[in-house]
């Protein structure tokens, strides 16, 4: 290998030409040298190539039953929604693995792969607040190990107006994939509060609806599949900035909303809508059950435009959580609220216990508030706040017991000291 210098005879890297003094390490081979910087660069090139090969087509796609069983471990109730989502997600990723996903624009050009082209099936999730819509989507993404992003439709406006462009939704997905665009192109985007961008009136208006119908129009292309230009730093586009190009053809969109008032539209269509004393009693008790009978024309009347509805072929619903379901949510799932707080108390070396009656009262209070499962955490925080404030300053407490009176009457919880526990153990021994 070439040597330079008159007195020191410095060796050079055969690839980049840097001398041994310019690098940290120079490794010798038969007649060649390579520096640590070139080795690191080679590793990066190999990792990029391996990442391209190890795309979604190489991972084992769980069957609908397996996806459903996984959802069962974390989500209480909502059986129809879990089944629909399991099938829809399985079909979506099976379509990608089979290589039937067309490139953007091929639908318009009439290009077919193997004579049969499988279209993408985005999902519309309808149901009251606090019933697990977002949690269902998050759990799905965790099972599939794909990038997942949550967006709020209320922040979106049509391009050129104050607010977020729809492309910012795609930026969140790219960020969730650590800026790996290939990985992001097979991720899941969950858009919440989609009912808030409904048309302000059923009939088209001469005034521009930039946060309603305008947003629906702007979402059409990315829902269907297009190559979108995304500003890497978010915000508005301007002509002199660079963009990230992302193909949304294989991105699964799950859009969700409470659609308050939709049950009245469904009732009017089906002829079950009564007035005053004529209203059927079972309808008064649980209007959300009628969500299961939703038809595209009901969504059109609610304020979604036909083109938007057409890009959401899978429509599934969730229903209000009843008392037994709320009690189960507190204690049964893997990430049950009681288990979460017990783990938090364990970090301070304290055992947290709940009476069954205490869980009943918490569920009853959540029902009264009408906020579904979200109300459970708020109530738990209110109940445990005084204990969580004092407990870290005390090292004599072994366990804390929450009873029904603690929840209902704000009574102090039962605190059992370490010496009491030790005495009980000695007696039992």
Curated annotation (Swiss-Prot):
Keyword hit for Nucleotide-binding:
yes
- Binding sites annotated in the UniProt record for Zn(2+): 13, 16, 35, 38
Biological-process GO terms, alphabetical: cell division; proteolysis involved in protein catabolic process
Keyword Electron transport in record? no
Specify which residues bind ATP according to the UniProt entry for this protein: 128-135
Question: Subunit info?
Answer: Component of the ClpX-ClpP complex. Forms a hexameric ring that, in the presence of ATP, binds to fourteen ClpP subunits assembled into a disk-like structure with a central cavity, resembling the structure of eukaryotic proteasomes.
Name the SUPFAM superfamilies on file: Glucocorticoid receptor-like (DNA-binding domain), P-loop containing nucleoside triphosphate hydrolases
**UniProt domain ClpX-type ZB: residue ranges:** 1-54
Q: Which GO terms describe its molecular function?
A: ATP binding; ATP hydrolysis activity; ATP-dependent protein folding chaperone; protein dimerization activity; unfolded protein binding; zinc ion binding
Database matches in Pfam families? AAA_2, ClpB_D2-small, zf-C4_ClpX
Job description of the protein = ATP-dependent specificity component of the Clp protease. It directs the protease to specific substrates. Can perform chaperone functions in the absence of ClpP.
Task: List the InterPro entries hit by this protein, alphabetically.
Answer: AAA+_ATPase (IPR003593), ATP-dep_Clp_protease_ClpX (IPR050052), ATPase_AAA_core (IPR003959), Clp_ATPase_C (IPR019489), Clp_protease_ATP-bd_su_ClpX (IPR004487), ClpX_bact (IPR046425), P-loop_NTPase (IPR027417), Znf_CppX_C4 (IPR010603)
Give the protein name, as stated in the record.
ATP-dependent Clp protease ATP-binding subunit ClpX
Keywords assigned by UniProt, alphabetized: ATP-binding, Chaperone, Metal-binding, Nucleotide-binding, Zinc
Question: Which HAMAP family does the protein's record reference?
Answer: ClpX (MF_00175)
Q: PROSITE patterns per the record?
A: CLPX_ZB
Report the superkingdom from the record.
Bacteria
* Native species: Arthrobacter sp. (strain FB24)
Q: Name one GO cellular component term.
A: HslUV protease complex
Which family is annotated?
Belongs to the ClpX chaperone family.
């Amino acid at each position: 290998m070439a040597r330079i210098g008159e007195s020191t005879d410095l060796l050079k890297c055969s690839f980049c030409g840097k001398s041994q003094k310019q690098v940290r390490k120079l490794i010798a081979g038969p007649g060649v040298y390579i520096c640590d910087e070139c080795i690191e660069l080679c590793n990066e090139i190999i990792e990029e190539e391996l990442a391209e090969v190890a795309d979604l087509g190489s991972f084992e796609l769980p069957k609908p039953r397996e996806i459903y069983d996984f959802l069962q471990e974390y989500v209480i109730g909502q059986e129809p929604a879990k089944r629909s989502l399991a099938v829809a997600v399985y079909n979506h990723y099976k379509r990608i693995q089979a290589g039937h996903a067309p490139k953007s624009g091929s639908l318009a050009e009439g290009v077919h792969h193997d004579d049969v082209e499988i279209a993408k099936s985005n999902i519309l999730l309808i149901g009251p607040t606090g019933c697990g819509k977002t949690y269902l989507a998050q759990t799905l993404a965790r099972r599939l190990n794909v990038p997942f992003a949550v967006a709020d439709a209320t922040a979106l406006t049509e391009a050129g107006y104050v607010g977020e462009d729809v492309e910012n939704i795609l930026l969140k997905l790219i960020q969730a994939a650590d800026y790996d665009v290939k990985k992001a192109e097979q991720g899941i985007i969950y858009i919440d509060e989609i009912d808030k961008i409904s048309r302000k009136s059923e009939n088209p208006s001469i005034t521009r609806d930039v946060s309603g119908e305008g947003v629906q129009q702007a979402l059409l292309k990315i829902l269907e599949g297009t190559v979108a230009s995304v500003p890497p730093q978010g915000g508005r586009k301007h002509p002199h900035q660079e963009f990230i190009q992302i193909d949304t053809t294989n991105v699964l969109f799950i859009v969700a909303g409470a659609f308050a008032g939709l049950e009245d539209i469904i009732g009017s269509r089906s002829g079950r809508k009564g007035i005053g004393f004529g209203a059927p009693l079972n309808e008064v008790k649980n209007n959300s059950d009628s969500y299961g009978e939703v038809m595209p024309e009901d969504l059109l009347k609610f304020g979604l435009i036909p083109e938007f509805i057409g890009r959401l072929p899978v429509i599934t619903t969730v229903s209000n959580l009843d008392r037994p379901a709320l009690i189960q949510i507190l204690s049964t799932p893997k990430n049950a609220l009681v288990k979460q707080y017990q783990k938090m108390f364990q970090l301070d070396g304290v055992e947290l216990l709940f009476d069954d009656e205490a869980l009943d009262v918490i569920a009853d209070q959540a029902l009264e508030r009408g906020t579904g499962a979200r109300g459970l955490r708020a109530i738990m925080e209110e109940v445990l706040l005084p204990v969580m404030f004092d407990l870290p300053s005390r090292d004599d407490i072994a366990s804390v017991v929450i009873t029904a009176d603690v929840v209902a009457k704000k009574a102090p919880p039962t605190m059992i000291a370490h010496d009491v526990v030790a005495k009980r153990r000695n007696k039992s021994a």
